[in-house]
Amino acid sequence: FVATIPASAAFNKSRIIDDFVFNAYNTMSTAQIDSFLNSFPDSCISTSRGFKAPNPTGYSPGTSFTYGTSVSAGTIIYNAAQAYKLNPRVILATLQKEQSLVTGTAGCSKLRYVGAMGNGCPDSGGGYNYSGFELYRIGSTVVKSVTGTCVNSAKSAGFSRQIITAVWKMKFWQQRSLGNVSWAEIHGSWDNSDDPALCYTYYMTPGNRARGGTGSGCTQVLSFDGNYTIDGTGVHMSTGATAALYVYTPHLHGNQVFVSTFESWFGSTLSNPVKLSYI
């Protein structure tokens, strides 16, 4: 599902994106996101096309994610960015990397909408079926069922669920890779107070980092050098955001597409050439 690579600057496999850029959640407003989408005549998720999906409205340990009435893609992306303090441009670049929904150049099939972020879509493929809840809508046509999607969980199936669960994962993985075991977004209708108990066993940035959690394999404190192998190539996890994106897409090519897409639209994924304090 990964798109082709547009022209861009050289790809630094060990520093995909800086944490400062990754965390810049106020880079675009709802109106700016919708305007950006409308600038592509064939966009699958523009207001010009009449696209809407349920609005992610909150999270709590007891009810998980909650959703409201259908709203524009810009509203969904903005609200997810605000909820987990993630740059909405990261979301837009991921939507394009995975399904080309921003430009619409690969078509606007139901499967692309339902697996919008490639979230929960393993390399082995899918073949999952879901029904009984709104996945998205175009104009007055509401889509409530899908057959053969790559998405392996109903919690992540459909445009809005793809967005909000992917954004949470990216931010959780970033924070854990930095050793922040107490991270949890708790504000307004968002209460992720159950996050500190979750196990994390993926890529870590260098230093003495706590994994946290109570699951199998969750050693509390270990020393990591930040060096791993991706697609047979040595990679150094220089930033938490870099580690998070490799957990999300454990391949060089997919992350190269992400960087190329982001930089062609929004500029560099790096805040400056100076190394951050935790590198």
Model-predicted regions and their roles:
Residues 49-59, 114, 127, 205, ...:
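Secreted/processed peptides and extracellular or luminal domains of membrane proteins
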Residues 96-101, 169-172:
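Glycine-rich, acidic and aromatic/proline-enriched surface loops and short helix-turn segments
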Residues 90-96, 118, 162-165:
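Structural recognition of the beta-strand scaffold that forms the well-ordered cores
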Residues 19-20, 24-99:
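Export/targeting segments at the very N-terminus of extracytoplasmic proteins
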Residues 100-106, 110, 152:
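Extracytoplasmic/secreted cell-surface and envelope-processing proteins
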Residues 1-9:
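Sec-dependent, cleavable N-terminal signal peptides
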Residues 8-35, 43, 124-279:
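Non-catalytic cell-wall polysaccharide-engagement segments
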Residues 57, 107-123:
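Short, surface-exposed glycine/acidic/tryptophan-bearing loops
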